[in-house]
Every structure is written in C-alpha cells, then in structure tokens.
From Swiss-Prot:
Signal peptide: none annotated. Pathway: Glycan degradation; xylan degradation. GO terms for biological process: xylan catabolic process. One of its GO terms (molecular function) is endo-1,4-beta-xylanase activity. InterPro entries: ConA-like_dom_sf, GH11/12, GH11_AS_1, GH11_AS_2, GH11_dom, Glyco_hydro_11. Disulfide bonds join 110-154. It holds the Pfam family Glyco_hydro_11. This is Endo-1,4-beta-xylanase. Gene3D superfamilies: 2.60.120.180.
Length: 194
C-alpha cells in the first residue's frame, strides 16, 4: 500500500507528500524537521519537510540517509505562483541526471560545487493548482552529497541571470525525496540556518 497524499504542518515544519499511487511507498513524519520515505514497485512520488511560504533566499541545512535504486532526486524543491513554477535544487540523484531533458542554461558556482542550470516545460501535468502547463527550473549539483547547506539565493540569482522569472509568490519550500519507477529509502532532517 501507499501513504495517502497529504500536506500541512507537522511539529513546526511544513510537509508535502504526493504519489500517483502506482507503487508501494510509505511517508512518515518524524519529530522536528525529520521525515522518512520507503518506496518501491513503480510509480512516481515526492515528499519532504520544510517551510511555507518559501523564500528566494534561505539557508537550508539538510542531513541524513539517502539510498536510491534507480531514478530519484534529493532536492530543495518548491513552487511559486504568478508565474506557476516548479523548481529543483538537486543535491543528490540516482541513476539519471534529472536535468538531462532540459534546456541548458550554463553553470553556476554555489554551495561549494558547480551546478548545471536548466529549464524545461511540463504540459498538462500535476501541479499545486491541479493539471497545468508550467515551467520547471533546475540547478543540479555536480559533486553529489546527502548533507550540507544550500543557500537558495545563489540559485535563484543564477536563474534570474539566465533570464528566468523568479518573482513569483512562493508556496512550500521543502527538502524533498522523489522517486520515479524506482526504489529506495530516505531519512532526512532539515533546518533553517539563516
């Protein structure tokens, strides 16, 4: 079975959990900024903990265990409205680079590594406002890691310099684990460190 989709506040942090119901995935809110996901047997899922609303510039510390088998991302992940944008600052990933299908916008040096910038468009896809067409912004770390601090402002500034609109109204901003027809385990703790 799969944990039903939900979102809201838990122990001082905002969480979001979504799956397409196609696999077996369990999402658990642990104390404070910690969550746990076990997944397998197909399907698409994404969940994690963080804040609502997000900020263009927040210092996000994350640490924990991330053990994917197949296509998966560990990212600072969120949405804006006006414009509707889904964004990923990818810190670690499984078998395939998530930005491979996006328009290459060059690289930026942030948080002690080089990140590859990209943009892609999703057509008639699930969003925070139902089925919509919207842009995705990507910043993908080359030196993968499962703990560290992300200065989101570095990435939003880089997207802006590449011509992307970063003036939207923030919805949630979480450190999310995503799986796509894969399996794995993650237990991640997040904190706002300025």
């Amino acid at each position: 079975g799969t944990t039903p989709n939900s979102e809201g506040w838990h122990d001082g942090y905002y969480y979001s959990w979504w799956s397409d119901g196609g696999g077996d995935s369990t999402y658990t809110n642990n104390s404070g900024g910690t969550y746990e996901i076990t997944w397998g047997n197909g399907g698409n899922l994404v969940g994690g903990k963080g804040w609502n609303p997000g900020l263009n510039a927040r210092a996000i510390h994350f640490t924990g265990v991330y053990q994917p088998n197949g296509t998966s991302y560990l990212s600072v992940y969120g949405w804006t409205r006006n414009p509707l944008v889904e964004y990923y600052i990818v810190e670690n990933f499984g078998s395939s680079n998530p930005s491979s299908g996006s328009t290459d916008l060059g690289t930026v040096s942030c948080d002690g590594s080089t990140y590859t910038l990209g943009q892609s468009t999703r057509y008639n896809a699930p969003s925070i406002d139902g089925t919509q067409t919207f842009n995705q912004y990507w910043s993908v770390r080359q030196d993968k890691r499962s703990s560290g601090t992300v200065q989101t402002g570095c990435h939003f500034d880089a997207w802006a310099s590449a011509g992307l609109n970063v003036t939207g109204d923030h919805y949630y901003q979480i450190v999310a684990t995503e799986g796509y027809f894969s399996s794995g385990y993650a237990r991640i703790t997040v904190a706002d460190v300025g």
